[in-house]
Amino acid sequence: MDTSRLTLDHFLSRFQLLRPQITHETLNQRQAAVLIPVVRRPQPGLLLTQRAIHLRKHAGQVAFPGGAVDSTDASLIAAALREAQEEVAIPPQAVEVIGVLPPVDSVTGFQVTPVVGIIPPNLPWRASEDEVSAVFEMPLAQALQLGRYHPLDVYRRGNSHRVWLSWYEHYFVWGMTANILRELALQIGVKP
């Protein structure tokens, strides 16, 4: 599938037609969720954040809004929506949730469920200075081009795992964020 002319309608029909399949068993027990905010435009965008540099974990990394499930969250989707509101001021009622991707294990011990949602283009996104240093929009068609991701095999604690690397403008996109974007591309039928 060629992503260069990807429209929102095409993305939605492909995502809803090809249901995600869980391909591996997750190992982590602690639950987290992220929102993959697709901006409603004829040529859709993807909202990403850069985490604040002072954070203990993943400082300065490009990420989706999200975080750990807490006791007030009714579901993984509720957790993703709450975190998106806290981090970038996206009101939960403004998100049209279209589905979830299979959970992925993080190196920090979380099982992370990506929640895909459509958001209006005119939201006044605002970064929470406590957690986010920047909010930016990337064209979804570019984010879903598999050729932009480069593999790096990392050996950690006697185990090997593959990390994906990419760039957008001056942002370095890698790790779980790049992996989730690749999985989303594969989910809608982009061929490697």
Swiss-Prot record:
Highest taxon of the lineage: Bacteria
CDD domains, per database record: NUDIX_CoAse_Nudt7 (cd03426)
InterPro entries membership: CoAse, NUDIX_hydrolase-like_dom_sf, NUDIX_hydrolase_dom, NUDIX_hydrolase_NudL_CS, Nudix_NudL
Top EC class, one word: hydrolase
Cofactor(s) listed: Mn(2+); Mg(2+)
Gene Ontology biological process terms from the UniProt entry: nucleoside diphosphate metabolic process
Enzyme Commission identifier(s): 3.6.1.-
Domain Nudix hydrolase: 29-160
Motif Nudix box in this chain: 67-89
Database matches in Gene3D superfamilies: Nucleoside Triphosphate Pyrophosphohydrolase
SUPFAM superfamilies referenced in this protein's UniProt entry, alphabetically: Nudix (SSF55811)
Residues where Mg(2+) binds: E83, E87
GO molecular function terms listed in the Swiss-Prot or TrEMBL record: coenzyme A diphosphatase activity; magnesium ion binding; manganese ion binding
Magnesium listed as a keyword: yes
Protein keywords: Hydrolase, Magnesium, Manganese, Metal-binding
NAD recorded as keyword: no
Pfam families assigned to the protein according to its UniProt record, in alphabetical order: NUDIX
Family classification: Belongs to the Nudix hydrolase family. PCD1 subfamily.
Alphabetized HAMAP family for the sequence: Nudix_NudL (MF_01592)
Primary role: Probably mediates the hydrolysis of some nucleoside diphosphate derivatives.
Protein name: Uncharacterized Nudix hydrolase NudL
